[in-house]
């Protein structure tokens, strides 16, 4: 026991996820990364989890690995008793029944493991423990989605190392594009093929003269696989 305690997303030949039974016994791991805060990374993670469940046939666990703000619990309106850091520290003692019992289930059907509210809770939690926990979870769920911090750190590195697919979220502002370009270059140097990196462009503002899809692709040297258009009503509803 534990001690102390969507439509299937596709692009030309590359997919965000595939059923685990198609390739291996453990589930697919998807890391959602974005190298700037406020661009829609967590919104992408939560909606992706709900969409995959809605398609049917797959169990989904969303793990909040954001070491700074961790907003998954707020966005999915769940109240945690246990969080990632507590569970990961006891990763060696994980038991399937105990692990499932501490997970929260969102009304969409997706399971959630939130981040701690206090960033200091991460201090005694190593990336190796996080990876061990994620591997354990992938043995229980068809799809494990990792929501990550908005800046590159050891946790982002650990998440992308484990992931079968890396969903890179970017916006059209210059700092986001610059950081996204560097991230994609880094992933390539780590051996990631272009088909394993899925870029989602979110238009967060209705600004005349904003970079086009073609401009973004040129800036980051990678195709934009999905675009989310600006919607004023959605922006108002989220405030």
Regions found by a protein language model. Name each.
Residues 25-28, 56-58, 108, 196, ...:
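Short coil/turn connectors at secondary-structure junctions
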Residues 55-112:
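Phosphate-binding loop that captures ATP/GTP phosphates
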Residues 15-23:
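Pre-Walker A adenine-sensing motif
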Residues 1-13:
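Receiver (REC) domain switch/output surface
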Residues 84, 237-239:
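C-terminal boundary of histidine-terminating zinc-finger modules
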Residues 124, 128-230, 236:
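Conserved catalytic-core segment of NTP-binding enzymes
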Residues 26-74:
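Walker A/P-loop phosphate-binding motif and the immediately C-terminal alpha-helix
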Residues 85-92, 119-125, 173-175:
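Flexible beta-alpha connector loops of hexameric P-loop NTPases
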């Amino acid at each position: 026991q534990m001690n102390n305690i969507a439509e299937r997303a596709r692009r030309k030949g590359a997919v965000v996820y595939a059923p685990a039974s198609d390739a291996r016994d453990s589930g697919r791991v998807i890391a959602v990364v974005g190298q700037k805060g406020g661009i829609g990374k967590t919104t992408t993670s939560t909606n992706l989890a709900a969409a995959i469940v809605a398609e049917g046939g797959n169990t989904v666990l969303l793990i909040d690995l954001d070491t700074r703000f961790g907003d998954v619990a707020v966005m999915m309106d769940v109240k945690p008793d246990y969080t990632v850091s507590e569970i990961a520290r006891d990763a060696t003692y994980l038991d399937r029944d105990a692990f499932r019992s501490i997970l929260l289930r969102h009304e969409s059907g997706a399971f959630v493991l939130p981040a701690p509210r206090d960033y200091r809770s991460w201090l005694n939690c190593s990336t190796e423990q996080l990876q061990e926990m994620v591997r354990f979870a992938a043995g229980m769920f068809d799809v494990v989605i990792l929501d990550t911090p908005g800046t590159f750190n050891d946790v982002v590195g650990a998440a992308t190392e484990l992931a079968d697919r890396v969903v890179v979220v970017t916006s059209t502002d210059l700092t986001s594009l610059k950081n996204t370009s560097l991230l994609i270059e880094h992933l390539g140097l780590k051996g990631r093929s272009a088909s394993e990196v899925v870029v989602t462009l979110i238009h967060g503002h209705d600004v005349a003269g904003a970079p086009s899809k073609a401009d973004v692709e040129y800036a980051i040297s990678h195709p934009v696989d999905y675009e989310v258009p600006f919607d004023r009503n959605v922006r108002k509803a989220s405030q």
